[in-house]
C-alpha cells in the first residue's frame, strides 16, 4: 500500500523452492521452507536508492542533500563527507555536536584504507584519583556507587566528562589529506544551517526532554530554548554563536590563502585557529569556571594522525574497522567465529541463525569489556583477531543452549579484568540517559568509500561560552577500575562504541556502513553485513530488516549496566522464533518494530558499478543516489 511493498527476496535467496511431490503428486513446502517463508513475511517501508556516479546515506534529509550537492558540484567523497560532518553537527544536535567525536574510515581510489580516530583525549587533570575521591553532584546524579562516601565514577553530563573535541580535527585531517576542496567551501552549508534551519520533530522533542537539565546551564538554555520556550517542529532554529564560530574558522583559512599558503597549509591554519587560538581559549576558560577539567594546554597538545585500520577476511571479503580504542573489533571477532558455520544452511533469521550470531557476539563482547582500550596506553592482545583464536572460541558455543556467563579469553599469564566483577551500576535521571549517534556513508564511482560514526556532545549538552559549541560527555566511557585497560588516564582515549565500517571484495569496493545505537552498533552492523554479503539483500532491505539485540555485555556508558542473557527481538519476527530461542535458554523480550535504537545506513557497490544506498527509516535516516 502506497510505497510499502512486500519484500522481494524469496526467489533471489532460493529459500522457498518446492520439494518433491508426495503421495498425490502435489508439490508441497517442507516445514523448514514454510518457516522460512514466514520469517521473510515483512514489509519494506522504503525503496532502495541507486546511483551511477555516487550514493550517500546519512542521518537526515538535510545532511544527505548537503552531501549530494558537494558531490554533484565536483567534490570527491571525502569533501562531501566532511561537509556532511559539519552540517550534521549543526542540525543533528540531539545526537551529535561540534564538540563531539567522529571516527572515520576512508578508502582512496588507489585501494588503500585509512582510519582517523576522531575522538579526543582526556585532559591532564582527568585522573583516576580525582574521580575516586570527588563528591557527588546532587543535581546531576541520583545515586552513586560509594567508596568511602565518594562517588567512584565519572558523571555522564556537565563539564567533568568533557574531552578535547575530536570531530573538528578529524574533519580537517580528512579534508587536508584526502579531499580536494578548501575548508570554506565544505563549511558554508553548515554555517548557513547554523544561522537558521527548520527544526524537526526529533530535535524539538529532545529539547523538551532535556529542559530540566538545560536550566542548570544558561549558555545551553539560551541556544536551545531562547526566551524560555522550546522550538516546535517547523520553527526556524538559530545557532548564531555557532555560525559565527564556523565563519571565523573560514576567515582563518582565507587569510592563509591570501598570504600565499597552499590549500593544505590553509587548512592547517584553520586547525591552529581552533586548537591553539581563541576558540580553544574560550572553551577552556568556560570549563575551568564551571569546575571542569579541560584546559587550553590540552587543546594545544592534541593532534590526530592517520592510522592503520584493523582488518579481517570473511569468505573473500576484507572487512575494515577502526582500532581497539573503539568496539569495532567485536564485529571482526564475531565474523571470524561465524566463518566456521554454514550460515546459508542455517537460513536468514532462523532461530539457529540468531542463536549462533548471539553466542558469537557474547564471546566477542566479553573480550571487548576485558581487553579493548587505547593501544597507545595498553598492549591489546594481538591474538584477539587471529583465526586460531576464533576457532578456540567457536568451540565454546553450544548449539543447543545459550550461555549465561561472561567468558573473556586468557592470553598466557595475562588474566582479563572484566567489569562484571566490580560494582559499577548506578541509576540515572531519565533526562540524562545517553542519547545516541548518527551515521554517514558514501560511495563514488572513482572507488572512494567514506564511513563515519559522528556522536558525542548530544542533548542535553553544555554550550561552552559564546562559541556555540556543545561539549562532549565521552569521558564517561572510561572506567574507574584500577588495573582495567580502559581505566581513566590523562591523555588517553576512552574505548568508545563508535564504529564506521568498510568492506571490499578482493580489493574492490563493496560496502560502507555505520549506525547509531551505542552497544548495539556492532550487533546491528553484523546483521546488516551478513544480510547483504551472505544472503544478497539489497542495501535498503539489509538495513530495514528485523534485527535482534543482545544485552549480554557491560554497557559502555551511563550506568555500565549488565543484563546477562537478555535478548531483544523485533516484533516483526514470527512467534516460533521467540519460542525456539526461549527454549534454547535465551531470556527473550519483545521490542517494538522500527524502534530498535540502532538505525543503520549503508551503501553497496554492485558488480556492474551501480551503487545502492539504504537508510533505516527509524530516526529520519535518508539515502540518495546520483
What annotation goes with each model-predicted range?
Residues 34, 280, 284, 292, ...:
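Internal maturation/activation junctions in enzymes
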Residues 1-10:
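Bacterial N-terminal signal peptides that target proteins for export
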Residues 24-65, 69, 77-269, 274-326:
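Noncatalytic scaffold domains of N-terminal-nucleophile
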